[in-house]
Amino acid sequence: MAVLSAPGLRGFRILGLRSSVGPAVQARGVHQSVATDGPSSTQPALPKARAVAPKPSSRGEYVVAKLDDLVNWARRSSLWPMTFGLACCAVEMMHMAAPRYDMDRFGVVFRASPRQSDVMIVAGTLTNKMAPALRKVYDQMPEPRYVVSMGSCANGGGYYHYSYSVVRGCDRIVPVDIYIPGCPPTAEALLYGILQLQRKIKRERRLQIWYRR
């Protein structure tokens, strides 16, 4: 067996075999290129692509961009969800609000009134009779408002997809921002969905869009 050696290091034996069994294999650096006889070896390395954010065109747009960052920071740090538990997924939603996961440390506080909420968590099976109530609660929420679809039943009907009394996805009634798969999804999955919603809010540019009109 060959002896492995690196520059600056002494050769060592493997499994007690002598170095005379085979030729020594020199360790190659990570960034060293392999020399080949083909024409591709003479081609220069391509530069890495860099995503450069567009610079503000004026001072006013710069101020508006900073205001957007400030508003988005305050908005994503104080999400107040409206509980809309419809089935077994609501148990995991309550589990996330319990001390084990402590959702309050992310600024997420459940509210009982839709007029004080900016997030709706649709947890469970949405039936045809419950659909008008869901839309009514959504219309009572102030702007900007977000919807989290929790579980397979809320996403697309789930186990009751072919039932005559079930809406095949709550996105047919209200616009959905975050989909959380699972039957039911765990509390960790719901918490991850809330964190993804915070990332989405961070990238919003509502004031810049208003300023450019």
From Swiss-Prot:
SUPFAM superfamilies: HydA/Nqo6-like. It comes from the Eukaryota. It is a peripheral membrane protein. Residues 1-38 form a transit peptide. One of its GO terms (biological process) is proton motive force-driven mitochondrial ATP synthesis. It catalyses: a ubiquinone + NADH + 5 H(+)(in) = a ubiquinol + NAD(+) + 4 H(+)(out). Its EC number is 7.1.1.2. It is an enzyme of class 7 (translocase). Pfam families: Oxidored_q6. Residues 33-44 have a biased composition (Polar residues). Residues 31-53 are annotated as: Disordered. It is linked to Mitochondrial complex I deficiency, nuclear type 3: A form of mitochondrial complex I deficiency, the most common biochemical signature of mitochondrial disorders, a group of highly heterogeneous conditions characterized by defective oxidative phosphorylation, which collectively affects 1 in 5-10000 live births. Clinical disorders have variable severity, ranging from lethal neonatal disease to adult-onset neurodegenerative disorders. Core subunit of respiratory chain NADH dehydrogenase (Complex I) which is composed of 45 different subunits. This is a component of the iron-sulfur (IP) fragment of the enzyme. NCBIfam families: nuoB_fam, PRK06411.1. This is NADH dehydrogenase [ubiquinone] iron-sulfur protein 7, mitochondrial. It comes from Homo sapiens. The gene is NDUFS7.
